[in-house]
Amino acid sequence: MRTAEITRNTNETRIRVAVNLDGTGKQTIDTGVPFLDHMLDQIARHGLIDLDIKADGDLHIDAHHTVEDVGITLGMAIAKAVGSKAGLRRYGHAYVPLDEALSRVVIDFSGRPGLEYHIDFTRARIGDFDVDLTREFFQGLVNHALMTLHIDNLRGFNAHHQCETVFKAFGRALRMALEVDPRMGDAVPSTKGVL
């Protein structure tokens, strides 16, 4: 099984993330940021990745450090669990609708971190959650999972729906990219022979 556990402690946050890339979507998530917990649940369920995440952060200031550092730590755990990338499909994509909202997410486990992020949220907050933190989460994740990630919210007027379609599509694209292709054997999906 492709599993990993990472603990990351700073002066601002204390975070532990455990992942099972070959899971069933089970999750235990407690970041102290309820909307983030809801979005991480979407990744687990739609990616069929088991997630166990516990975060304690400086929420008395705001949620920025916690959200970003959860992204960083999750990215580190995914990278560790993926390992050499032998046999990996490497690429994944998904379109996900939710009522009026539609998002597209495309992933390449290239070893080169890059984020193309295009969400024009219709409001600045979803409940207590600052929508700007969505980018911070994905930037942290991308930088440490060493993936290229394209996120496009194609339409939507309900900010909750916009965000949820992105996280669901990310989970589904991640599931596709991380699948092992039996025809690949132990080959790495690159002409370089390494990713």
Swiss-Prot record:
Keywords recorded for this protein, A-Z: Amino-acid biosynthesis, Cytoplasm, Histidine biosynthesis, Lyase
Keyword Cytoplasm: yes
Record bears the keyword Zinc: no
GO MF: imidazoleglycerol-phosphate dehydratase activity
Spans through the membrane: none
Reactions catalysed: D-erythro-1-(imidazol-4-yl)glycerol 3-phosphate = 3-(imidazol-4-yl)-2-oxopropyl phosphate + H2O
Listed InterPro entries: IGPD_sf, ImidazoleglycerolP_deHydtase, ImidazoleglycerP_deHydtase_CS, Ribosomal_Su5_D2-typ_SF
Source taxon at top rank: Bacteria
Single Gene Ontology BP annotation: L-histidine biosynthetic process
Enzyme Commission identifier(s): 4.2.1.19
SUPFAM superfamilies with a match to the protein in the record: Ribosomal protein S5 domain 2-like
A GO cellular component annotation in the UniProt record: cytoplasm
Biological or metabolic pathway of the protein: Amino-acid biosynthesis; L-histidine biosynthesis; L-histidine from 5-phospho-alpha-D-ribose 1-diphosphate: step 6/9
Annotated compartments: Cytoplasm
Cited PANTHER family: IMIDAZOLEGLYCEROL-PHOSPHATE DEHYDRATASE, IMIDAZOLEGLYCEROL-PHOSPHATE DEHYDRATASE HIS7
Family per record: Belongs to the imidazoleglycerol-phosphate dehydratase family.
Name of the protein this chain belongs to: Imidazoleglycerol-phosphate dehydratase
Native organism: Bordetella pertussis (strain Tohama I / ATCC BAA-589 / NCTC 13251)
Source species taxonomy: Bacteria, Pseudomonadati, Pseudomonadota, Betaproteobacteria, Burkholderiales
Gene: hisB
